[in-house]
Amino acid sequence: MQVGFVSQTNCRSFPACIVFLFQMSQRQRSFNANLRVFKSKCKKIYIG
């Protein structure tokens, strides 16, 4: 199940698998907070 999985991400400091776990989580506040950190570290981000 790779629904909403981040693909083609060139960012080693912030693995895409961690973002996937955030998406699977029902806590939107934690996801949005971590997503801001992810955006600041990565330029290209693809979320389905």
Curated annotation (Swiss-Prot):
Its main location: mitochondrion. The keyword Mitochondrion applies. It is found in: Mitochondrion. Residues 1-28 form a transit peptide. One of its GO terms (cellular component) is mitochondrion. It comes from the Eukaryota. Keywords: Mitochondrion, Transit peptide. Disruption phenotype: Increases cellular tolerance to 2-deoxy-glucose. This is 2-deoxy-glucose resistant protein 1, mitochondrial. It comes from Saccharomyces cerevisiae (strain ATCC 204508 / S288c).
